[in-house]
Amino acid sequence: MPAYFQRPENALKRANEFLEVGKKQPALDVLYDVMKSKKHRTWQKIHEPIMLKYLELCVDLRKSHLAKEGLYQYKNICQQVNIKSLEDVVRAYLKMAEEKTEAAKEESQQMVLDIEDLDNIQTPESVLLSAVSGEDTQDRTDRLLLTPWVKFLWESYRQCLDLLRNNSRVERLYHDIAQQAFKFCLQYTRKAEFRKLCDNLRMHLSQIQRHHNQSTAINLNNPESQSMHLETRLVQLDSAISMELWQEAFKAVEDIHGLFSLSKKPPKPQLMANYYNKVSTVFWKSGNALFHASTLHRLYHLSREMRKNLTQDEMQRMSTRVLLATLSIPITPERTDIARLLDMDGIIVEKQRRLATLLGLQAPPTRIGLINDMVRFNVLQYVVPEVKDLYNWLEVEFNPLKLCERVTKVLNWVREQPEKEPELQQYVPQLQNNTILRLLQQVSQIYQSIEFSRLTSLVPFVDAFQLERAIVDAARHCDLQVRIDHTSRTLSFGSDLNYATREDAPIGPHLQSMPSEQIRNQLTAMSSVLAKALEVIKPAHILQEKEEQHQLAVTAYLKNSRKEHQRILARRQTIEERKERLESLNIQREKEELEQREAELQKVRKAEEERLRQEAKEREKERILQEHEQIKKKTVRERLEQIKKTELGAKAFKDIDIEDLEELDPDFIMAKQVEQLEKEKKELQERLKNQEKKIDYFERAKRLEEIPLIKSAYEEQRIKDMDLWEQQEEERITTMQLEREKALEHKNRMSRMLEDRDLFVMRLKAARQSVYEEKLKQFEERLAEERHNRLEERKRQRKEERRITYYREKEEEEQRRAEEQMLKEREERERAERAKREEELREYQERVKKLEEVERKKRQRELEIEERERRREEERRLGDSSLSRKDSRWGDRDSEGTWRKGPEADSEWRRGPPEKEWRRGEGRDEDRSHRRDEERPRRLGDDEDREPSLRPDDDRVPRRGMDDDRGPRRGPEEDRFSRRGADDDRPSWRNTDDDRPPRRIADEDRGNWRHADDDRPPRRGLDEDRGSWRTADEDRGPRRGMDDDRGPRRGGADDERSSWRNADDDRGPRRGLDDDRGPRRGMDDDRGPRRGMDDDRGPRRGMDDDRGPRRGLDDDRGPWRNADDDRIPRRGAEDDRGPWRNMDDDRLSRRADDDRFPRRGDDSRPGPWRPLVKPGGWREKEKAREESWGPPRESRPSEEREWDREKERDRDNQDREENDKDPERERDRERDVDREDRFRRPRDEGGWRRGPAEESSSWRDSSRRDDRDRDDRRRERDDRRDLRERRDLRDDRDRRGPPLRSEREEVSSWRRADDRKDDRVEERDPPRRVPPPALSRDRERDRDREREGEKEKASWRAEKDRESLRRTKNETDEDGWTTVRR
């Protein structure tokens, strides 16, 4: 489109300018550009006149293809906005085309075009004919004027129908245009176009059924759509009948029946009557009198059933037509000789079945059936009297001599009714033929021969030639046994005695059989006569003998019938089995082949899909990149154009082209803009300064001149206001005086009624006083009764409330006393336990000192012996001292930097037994517990001295960790002990929950499991003496951590570990009290918080942490859980038991002022068995922070702890029975259990969860426990816990640095590989002892925390009310951890 036609209004104006000068083609081009433009795809009001003008030009120029394009574009524009505009435009277009065609028709004398097909106007024959015959002026005028316009109008109809098809919004317009097209075909007798139009409509209907999922699709189940389609098809049927296109009419009938079948509801009776009427015409025109009569039967029954206002005349007319149509059905069967020879029975039957379907019949009708229906439904009684006897004469009575005379009277009456009954005239020829046939059938039964003249006299309504033809047809098709003798002019009947009639021969009135039929049935008659004679001839005893013989035969049959039957069944079963076997084999083979083919096809398909997917991804990626580049360039260009359009941009970039600007730096563009802006700003300020001086003088002068004028105007306005006020005041006074006079008049007039009013009021009060007093009395009585009832109800309620309050206070008092008593008992018990622990701790430390001294001396002696043995061995092997090696094996190991065993042989006193006794405990000699002091210098660097005792000579590959030389895990086939099992005879105190590392020097009083002189380094990862969490069939490879490179743990049903370890935890269990390993994954461990509901551990961060955070509720777990421990797991939403804590232990951050006694698994406490860790480290901070993530917890009553201890004692008894075989290990276990019982704190019951009833017992199981009270108490405890956690939670991670490492931490077993070499010298020093904690201070702090907890319990409701005013704030640190601040 040209640049100066950006708006549609301008285009329309330009087109009108072209039309004024007579240029239609340029005007059409202008409007065409507007309709094709993509910038005007939104409908506007101006579009409709543009489209009308565009179509007008298309009609004038006969540009049907341009009109089609324009209509399609306009449909896309206004379909979603204004569909009415599209209808108006289409109707206007067709109206203009019709007007042009009518004008051309008036100018032409040719009313009906001789051209057969408008799409192919000039055929070769027409060209040759015009060249030979010549063409006059009128013919040329008709060809040049009328023919193009008729073709244009036809194309317009066809284009509009294609445009509007399958669109529910313009469905009415579509059917209107279709009906107009039918009228066009009928008006101009366009048979070829009519056929094309019918095919197009049929194709559109099929498309509607296929594309029913579109948004604008037509729903054929809609009654309105069905009625419109049926209406159009009926118009099509009428037009086809009018144009005598019976093939198209029959197709229209099929289309109408198809629409009937689509409809769920039956069509209207009027529509069905019209349909039957049209179908009957089609059948009669096609020569099918049988279905024509059947259609009239259907129409007759429909009219009788549905029409309530059916008159007697209409009934007679319909019944007469039905009778004549039924009797007009040819008696001659439709099957001809050619059909019999070609065996076309199937085709005929199929054709009749289709025709019956169009009428809704189950089976094709027959002439006899229709006659019987006519008699059964009593149609004859409504027939006019003149025709009523025709049925009896033709079908019932046998009177050949008077038959034609009677029928002639009826036919003459029918011929006399052309005006009243025009449709009856068509039945006369068929009735004459049937009458002749009936006459011949009846005459053949009476006469053997008859003269032709005599027969002609019996049939007066036909001549001799027609009669002879009828006789010949009857002999050919109706099995009439007749011969014509032309010499004697006679007819002979039944002369051929060998003739046999066909089965489909017509049947009529019967008098006697023909001679040939009598001869053919002679044997049958003879048989019946002989049977009667035998009954007379044969006596009774012969019949009795026959009966006896019959019984004997029956008996013999019954005797052998079962056996014979079984034999037949067995043979049949054998045959069936063989068939089934062969079929199964064939099916199996075909199935295998099919599966093989499907597998190959699947592979090919997958490969092809993968290739296509990759190609699609690459193409999509390239397309996205190109689009991004184009969008980027377009955005930059538009931005630069916008900048240049502004005054500032035009000045700044007037000397620079847009192409150059695209390559410039954005900073340069911005600098240019800023520079130009500053420049204009300075110029503006200078202009404002110059104007300021001028404006000041001018304003001063104006105001001096205004002063006198303003004063004079003020005086004038004041005078006008005063006059106006005086005038309004006078009017107000006058009005008030008039109103007072009128009020006095009203008063005088109304005062005369005062006495009457008082009298009326007095009478009314006297009449209603008694009624008022009665109602007042009733009200007072009801009031007193209601007041008494309410007082009684209130008294009862107060009494009930006092009773409920008394029992509730009594119950609370009992509960409080019970809790106080339990608290006192717990304090006393804990105080006694602490005193006992202090005493045992002192004894333990003294014993440790002695053991350390013994171990040091023994280790020194062993070193001297080992040194001498090593030198002697070297001298014997080498024979000279030139091969100078390191002075001691310590140097070798230091240079190697690993714990692995070298290839040299071990000393005999160091070599363990050949069997794997070290797995069962026998391999640990008594002095291992005394070697710990000497082992310390070699802990990291020289581990090969204990290798023979640790593992046998097996073929396992070494571990891949930095210091773990154990072989990979093996299955149950090797002789190692399985990780899990009831027959595991390892020390039973190492259970699934115990993830502590091996005991070090200070706590090694456990017998032969870890002796003081055990020179093995600390076990890494999941070493051989861990608890039973590994099953016997587990064959996983080694761990992959810092010192343990085995794979992650495998969850599942066979993993019997305690529930504090989830299935996705890939770390090995902690190995004991002094486990000081760091996080599992090193410095980059950025995993989120643990998954336990009440996890109070810190995150797994930092390589210098004294131990990695625990997983779940295992930070204070019991130290000697066995594999068969039946306690419920303390992890997951179903776990109702919290960790073992005190009643007031809120499990927040473990700060330096924590007065609780050190627990097992807690590395933060000082002691000889724990590294000294600075309190308030990252674990305490993380525990305080993560405490806000889990649900609140309450302490567990002492009864729960006693229950758990009883279960533990039961497990101890089981373990003792298992360990009777190993008394050394039993002593070791008893010492360890004794120590752990001393230092283990009692666990608390989480108040927010409860365990199963069969495994938990507490004071709540009393008679007062019910669901509601328990829920209330649980909610109260949850609220108190939540308030306490939010109040005590302090995120002090930002204020504190990383945890300081003490001397005990420097030798922790989880140290990185690059730190071990530097720390080996430090590890050789003996461990330093740390004094026990101050127990008195612990007791004081414990009591303070309990008192504080009691205060918090009392004030939890006030805190809860204030809690709604607080807001939460989530803070995220640099490590990704989120802290909830309240």
Curated annotation (Swiss-Prot):
Localization per Swiss-Prot or TrEMBL: Cytoplasm
Keyword RNA-binding: yes
Coiled-coil portions: 82-120
Entries under Pfam families matching the protein: eIF3a_PCI_TPR-like (PF22591), PCI (PF01399)
Residue span, PCI domain: 315-498
SMART domains: PINT
Repeat positions for Sequence: 925-934, 935-942, 943-952, 953-962, 963-972, 973-982, 983-992, 993-1002, 1003-1012, 1013-1022, 1023-1032, 1033-1042, 1043-1052, 1054-1063, 1064-1073, 1074-1083, 1084-1093, 1094-1103, 1104-1113, 1114-1123, 1124-1133, 1134-1143, 1144-1152, 1153-1162, 1163-1172
InterPro entries assigned to the protein according to its UniProt record, in alphabetical order: EIF3A (IPR027512), eIF3a_PCI_TPR-like (IPR054711), PCI_dom (IPR000717)
Modified residues (Phosphoserine): S492, S584, S881, S882, S895, S949, S1028, S1188, S1198, S1262, S1336, S1364
Record-level GO BP terms: formation of cytoplasmic translation initiation complex; IRES-dependent viral translational initiation; negative regulation of ERK1 and ERK2 cascade; translation reinitiation; translational initiation; viral translational termination-reinitiation
Region Disordered: start-end pairs: 810-844, 866-1382
Stretches the record annotates as 25 X 10 AA approximate tandem repeats of [DE]-[DE]-[DE]-R-[SEVGFPILV]-[HPSN]-[RSW]-[RL]-[DRGTIHN]-[EPMANLGDT]: 925-1172
Modification note: Phosphorylated. Phosphorylation is enhanced upon serum stimulation.
Residues the record lists as N6-acetyllysine modifications: K68
Predominant location category: cytoplasm
An example molecular function term from Gene Ontology annotations: translation initiation factor activity
CC per GO annotation: cytoplasm; cytosol; eukaryotic 43S preinitiation complex; eukaryotic 48S preinitiation complex; eukaryotic translation initiation factor 3 complex; eukaryotic translation initiation factor 3 complex, eIF3e; eukaryotic translation initiation factor 3 complex, eIF3m; membrane
Organism domain of life: Eukaryota
UniProt keyword annotation of Secreted present: no
Basic and acidic residues compositional bias, start-end: 866-1165, 1177-1328, 1336-1371
Region (Interaction with EIF3B): 664-835
UniProt entry keywords in alphabetical sequence: Acetylation, Coiled coil, Cytoplasm, Host-virus interaction, Initiation factor, Phosphoprotein, Protein biosynthesis, Repeat, RNA-binding
Subunit structure: Interacts with EIF4G1. Component of the eukaryotic translation initiation factor 3 (eIF-3) complex, which is composed of 13 subunits: EIF3A, EIF3B, EIF3C, EIF3D, EIF3E, EIF3F, EIF3G, EIF3H, EIF3I, EIF3J, EIF3K, EIF3L and EIF3M. The eIF-3 complex appears to include 3 stable modules: module A is composed of EIF3A, EIF3B, EIF3G and EIF3I; module B is composed of EIF3F, EIF3H, and EIF3M; and module C is composed of EIF3C, EIF3D, EIF3E, EIF3L and EIF3K. EIF3C of module C binds EIF3B of module A and EIF3H of module B, thereby linking the three modules.
UniProt similarity note: Belongs to the eIF-3 subunit A family.
Function, as annotated: RNA-binding component of the eukaryotic translation initiation factor 3 (eIF-3) complex, which is required for several steps in the initiation of protein synthesis. The eIF-3 complex associates with the 40S ribosome and facilitates the recruitment of eIF-1, eIF-1A, eIF-2:GTP:methionyl-tRNAi and eIF-5 to form the 43S pre-initiation complex (43S PIC). The eIF-3 complex stimulates mRNA recruitment to the 43S PIC and scanning of the mRNA for AUG recognition. (Microbial infection) Essential for the initiation of translation on type-1 viral ribosomal entry sites (IRESs), like for HCV, PV, EV71 or BEV translation.
Annotated protein name in UniProt: Eukaryotic translation initiation factor 3 subunit A
Organism (species): Homo sapiens (Human)
The organism's taxonomic lineage, starting at the top: Eukaryota, Metazoa, Chordata, Craniata, Vertebrata
